[in-house]
């Protein structure tokens, strides 16, 4: 099967990143101003379009500095004194005293583009205008001037940019009014005069040409630029006047000046005249318009030079356009066609109606042909579909939008969508690239229209078309882009037992019981101790299944691992606030299934503590047997703690090392991912970055490429609070293959749209790159569990939000299975679903019998009346993976020696019930603790070498502490796909002699 190629792609707009933590999220969104300079206030979001402006008086554009304030200033100062100001498309400003008839108000959410000069303000959108009002009543409604001297109104007539009703454009000194235009036509000796598009004395003539006919007066709805109480035509419509007096001259002079116009042959900066060109035959041949009643060749060239353009064009006496090439198949016209005098210098030619006087600083002028849809030579398996109409203004068929103002191309858009696993792509408004699924088009009632309606060139490729306003050039992937399997055997969820605690940390001990820690003392129950142990063998007897334990300080958002000492102690570090952030807590599992233990958590902050207070730290067992603790903050929503430290702390020494990259990326790097690599170096993943560290100095050895995020937001993150989950993919004897790391889920800043992809990397490859695989659904706060057969279950989490209280919604009830033995793009199977929402503070843990324990959910999301949207979840479930759902009897084995040295050989005696020794496998899964989606062993699984004679098999332990850091492992035997119950083995001993630490009388040390 053909699979998508993963490419490096253009970056998209940066998005304001909110600072968010477990209990708060401060959203920093752009603002719709409710109050503005002086008495101006917001008047709402209004529909606008290029054919009939809602505000049709003065206007200007600023591609880099537009703000609400600057637009209001423009509309209320100098010769402008308007009661309405409007900002549109991030960079355009419009003024007027009237809202055009038929203009309609829409939801403020549709005005969603930020201003080019202030990203904290909204400046409308495509065909959407943020309107502001100064509080004063507008002047009287404009009128159609019935007569001006001997000129009499004939009404509103249709016109066209290609077939003019009147043949001769006319230059007018100053801003256009009915009186100034009729005077100019009379002075030039013409019978008819027409005013159009507010500021154009566009036509004078002796006859009415090209079949121009009367139209309704409402079509001439634009007020004159020089007098807002008069109407001066509209788009492609003119107010026509007839001279009833006696003409003293016969009309024949296009400029009306009576003098020959000069072509400026030499300008500063190497600018030269390039000729007269036809405009609007197929569309505007230049963009970046500037209008000025005092326009000159020199001022237009200066404007274009300041904006780094190489071509300047002047039209209609007062219009200046800039660009670097002429587009839409521009063709030359006779120089005599450019016969209108400049508004600011009557001796210079400034084009004419649909004629541009063109100047260039490069000598040559590049002509870009009329753009067409790109239908051949497409990347991958993309196929052009046609022009798709959006369902309604402001809504979109495809969900993910990129805005590439200057560099949108069909190829870039298709590659971006394919790289993130989306088989439908659409290009719109020249600069927008949308990605999604073909089903999105169907579900949103997408309708194909004529290809001719998608007529806007791509911002980065003017030769090809990229849709139009509310129209997209659509492309589909021809083939299967994401092969998500739907097997018949999908396993199932089962209710296990009601809980006494809403856990935030779950750990399976070597006594085969599960310890739970909660955010003490914030339990649902006043008498909760914050710590309990569950005996899985007694779940049918609720009163016997739970054992009460105790912690002395608040473990909320701490980190846990299993020590390699003889007792397999569980160590928990960090906490919620104050003294608890320094906490070090130890528990030695005891008892056995069906028999209560007596040990409890041990803690004494006066004797044993971290060197720095930490909330949301990660802990990792190093190859030398010491404990690495990294990151966090100084307390709940406190300043960053961007450092690492080593436990046990040597006498008199401080092991803290500051990490500048954690300082820089706070608060989006909490619970960083830590994994020991086969080289002995350490992988650290935080926010959307990753690097490899030296195991002795902790200096950076390699900065890895940034992690891919969302298709439309490269600022998406993978660690808390934009929380994903990470594991190490399987290692197989003889351990020569490079190791691979898998990270799934996460979220985006701002809107907090969860990610629907997994990414993987071989960090120690010669040229490491991330490979992206799309998941069937979005997921933030997921959990990932390593299974004995080398597959991984992905479950829990939400479709939207980030980690923290009340910050996520729309639970993801479905479970997935990731199988790294399959080809990339074909590794995910869709499993069963639950009815229990598992959001913030949920866990998933492998049990010794091969089932997955699913617990927790502490979202604290409430309705306005205070009732919970999602409950504090006490119910504990198990998931029966497909390998146990077949009904096969699990294999069995016995083992004599469970304390293994690296590279040693150890015997087991196996009993298989389905297969034979030839199909048997053996796996070792490192002991771990689950919290916030972080498996602090990295979910390490090893398939060691073994040989068998009869039913006695000899396993060779992993060769070194880089492949297998010291610690306890669950040993499984697999009969085909079916795992046995596990046995605990310790591999690599206790090289740092943690079993003798800490040496205080109130701590129990199990020995090494």
List the predicted regions and their residue ranges.
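Beta-propeller domains
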Residues: 371, 483-494, 509-551, 575-594, 665-802
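Asp-box/WD-like beta-propeller blade repeats and closely related beta-sheet repeat scaffolds
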Residues: 582-672
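Beta-propeller blade signature
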Residues: 529-538, 582-594, 640-652, 690-692, ...
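Immunoglobulin-like IPT/TIG beta-sandwich domains and homologous Ig-like subdomains
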Residues: 519, 526, 530-534, 906-978
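Beta-propeller and closely related beta-sheet repeat lectin domains
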Residues: 191, 310, 423, 502-507, ...
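Conserved blade-ending motifs and adjacent loop-strand segments that build the rim/top face
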Residues: 711, 770-782, 822-846, 939-943
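Peripheral, non-catalytic regulatory segments
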Residues: 15-483
